[in-house]
Every structure is written in C-alpha cells, then in structure tokens.
UniProtKB/Swiss-Prot annotation:
Keywords: ATP-binding, Cytoplasm, Disulfide bond, Nucleotide-binding, RNA-binding, Transferase, tRNA processing, tRNA-binding. The active site is at C108 (nucleophile), C204 (cysteine persulfide intermediate). The gene is mnmA. This is tRNA-specific 2-thiouridylase MnmA. It comes from Pseudomonas syringae pv. tomato (strain ATCC BAA-871 / DC3000). Pfam families: tRNA_Me_trans, tRNA_Me_trans_C, tRNA_Me_trans_M. It is an enzyme of class 2 (transferase). PANTHER family: MITOCHONDRIAL TRNA-SPECIFIC 2-THIOURIDYLASE 1 (PTHR11933:SF5), TRNA 5-METHYLAMINOMETHYL-2-THIOURIDYLATE -METHYLTRANSFERASE (PTHR11933). Disulfide bonds join C108-C204. CDD domains: MnmA_TRMU-like (cd01998).
Length: 376
C-alpha cells in the first residue's frame, strides 16, 4: 500500500524535510516520480555556542543542497532553534534534573518536525509535508492511522507515537514501504551525494561529545553513594542523572572483596537519598517489572478504554512487541505485562500497538517491580 499519489487533475505541492541523510533524499526522489510538485526544507534546530558544529549542521545542509541541486528542486531553510530550546531541550534538562531518562527525539517529532515544520510548510503554500521516517499511514473510516514501517529493523513508529492523526494525515512517508538496502540502491541509481552516508545516531545536539561532559555544562553534579541491595556502600557516583536503569558500563566498581565476578548493573535511582542501588547479574530480579504507570497517553487517534484492553507494547526502541493489558485508572493508565520486562525506565516512553497499528504512548512514570515490594 503506497502513500496516496495525487490525482491527474490536481498537482499537489509537497515539502520534504531534508535532513542531509539518505532517507529524506530518496523520499524526495520517490515523490517526484509519483508526480508531486516537490520542494525541500532543511531545518536547523540547535545553535552551537562554542564555535563547533557538533550537530554537523553545515555538512548536513551542504548534503541536502547537493541532493536538491542534483534532482532539480528548491531547498528552503528554516531555523527552529528557539522552538527546540523552549519545547524540547528545557524539558530534557528538567527530566534529567528529576532523575529520569528522557527521549528528546520523541518530543522533537511532536513539537518540531510535525508542528513547527508543518506549520511553516503550510505557510509556504504546501499541501502536504513528507519525511524520511520508516513508518506508513493508512486512511480508513475518516481517520488516518500510523502503521509500522515494513522494514522491522528500521521501523520508527516508536518515535512518532506522540504525533496526532491530523498531523499524520498531512504527511507522506515514501520510504516506509521499503527496506534500507532498497533506499540506498535508489540513491545510488540517482547519483545522490547521500547514497553512502552513514545513518545518524544519538542525540543531535550532543554529537560526538561524551554525554556526561555535555550534561555538566547545564546541570551541576550531585555526587552520592553507590550501594548494594543490602545497603553496603561500594563506591561513589558523580550524579544520578548520568546513570540509567540497567546500565552496566561506567559504574567504576569491580574487584570487590567477597563479590563474584558477575558484572554490576544499576537497579534503582534513589532520588530521596541521592543513592545509586546496584546489583550483580544481567537477570537480577530487581531489574524486572510486571507493570508500569503513565499519567498521560498521546493517542494518534482516540481509543475506547472503558474496559481493559489486550494490546502489545514496547518500552524501548527496537524491542519486540510485548503482550500487555492496558487499563484506565484514576491517576492515568496502567499497563500490565504478560511476561517480566527488563529495565523499564522512568522518563522513557511506552508505546502501544494493535498489530501493525501504532496507537500512541506516554512517558513511563512508575515501573512496578516483578518481585513483591516488601522484598525490595
């Protein structure tokens, strides 16, 4: 099922969000082949204040311009750095300050790519926008559904779950029907400068810097004790914000007397006492949760939760779908899983699915332990 093509009687104008990567480049090519009137837009969402382009913005803009020149379309540029700071980055810092582990890409999609960019494109006279995300859309019964991308290794519906159906209805996702090797082959065939460009990874505004070094620029470190589940102090941490549930690397502990050689993992971030609770073993019981709570769910389209509903969910990107029961509670929503879930992390997102349909999701606020609380 392809994204809808324009009728012969109506040439629709589409503005593609050109990131300087291969996916958006090929999206523009495919839309041109489908008969759309295509233009590109490069958005800059971060202002470097130290003279170094950590987000490779200059290089990405040059690549986007080279692709647009090659295929003969106009490239607009827009600076959404102020919107990004106000609506994404400040929230990112607040979450870390509160001891949670946020995902800024999800907020960026909701507030920037499918809000600021969409509004700007409509102001330029576009009928639709397009992005290089690996997702699909389907119009059915007067609503627009968000579907998983066909390539399970690249499906990005997890990151778009907070975008509403009205915004999805105004967006085309040309590469959502394809697998990554096909996308690169199309780019090669058309001689695009981005054909062999590596996929971007990590958070754009951090770039190649160490994450801890970046955070220290904005949040003061608050050192505290690292303790075992029995309460023994075995080390010091530089700040809870630098650690996440299930983390193994970078704890600075090991070789302890009377301890086994099993690796140590972060089990709990005790905010009240500024303590990091750790335990040994990848399958430590404290790492597993049976349920989670979220106070607010962003639905692509509203769903009926008048009674508990069997769905599947992901608590992290690229996780396989996990069967669960979702119910509305007085304080929000509770998802109970059929199987124990490892390293459910407050601040991250839980995303719900009904088969290939991405229904929506919310921020995890509480992870309920698989073992009884009195054992913890």
């Amino acid at each position: 099922m392809r994204d809808p093509a324009p009728s012969n009687s109506e040439m629709k104008r589409v503005i593609v969000g050109m990131s300087g990567g291969v996916d958006s480049s090929v999206s523009a090519v495919l839309l041109m082949e489908q008969g759309y009137q295509v233009e590109g837009l490069f958005m800059k969402n971060w202002e470097e204040d130290d003279g170094t382009e950590y987000c490779t913005a200059r290089e990405d803009l040059a690549d986007a311009q080279a692709v647009c020149d090659r295929i003969g379309i106009k490239l607009h540029t827009a600076n959404f750095a102020a919107e990004y700071w106000d609506n994404v980055f400040e929230h990112f810092l607040e979450e870390y300050k509160a001891g949670r582990t946020p995902n800024p890409d999800i907020l960026c999609n909701r507030e920037i790519k499918f809000k600021a960019f969409l509004d700007y494109a409509l102001m330029l006279g576009a009928d639709l926008i397009a992005t290089g995300h690996y997702v699909r859309r389907r119009d059915i019964d007067g609503r627009t559904e968000l579907l998983k991308g066909l390539d399970p290794n690249k499906d990005q519906s997890y990151f778009l779950h907070a975008v509403g159906g009205e915004q999805i209805a105004r967006t085309l996702f040309p590469v959502g029907e394809l697998e990554k090797p096909q996308v690169r082959a199309i780019a090669e065939k058309h001689g695009l400068a981005t054909a062999k460009k590596k996929d971007s990874t990590g958070i754009c505004f951090i770039g190649e810097r160490r994450f801890t070094d970046f955070l220290r620029q904005y949040l003061p470190a608050q050192p505290g004790d690292i303790k075992t589940t029995e309460g023994e102090v075995i080390g010091r941490h530089s700040g809870l914000m630098y650690h996440t549930i299930g983390q193994r690397q970078g704890l600075g502990i090991g070789g302890l007397k009377d301890a086994s050689d099993d690796p140590w993992y972060v089990l709990v971030k005790d905010l009240d006492n500024n303590e990091l609770i750790v335990g040994q073993g990848n399958d430590h019981p404290w790492l597993f949760s049976r349920a989670l709570v979220s106070s607010e769910i962003y639905w692509v389209n509203p769903i009926d939760l008048s009674s508990p509903r069997k769905l599947t969910a992901k608590v992290r990107y690229r996780q396989s779908d996990q069967p669960c029961t979702l119910e509305k509670t007085a304080g929000g929503y509770r998802a109970t899983f059929d199987d124990p879930q490892r390293a459910v992390t407050p601040g991250q997102s839980v995303v719900f699915y009904d088969g290939e349909i991405c229904l929506g999701g919310g921020v995890i606020e509480i992870a309920e332990p698989w073992t009884s609380k009195d054992k913890r």
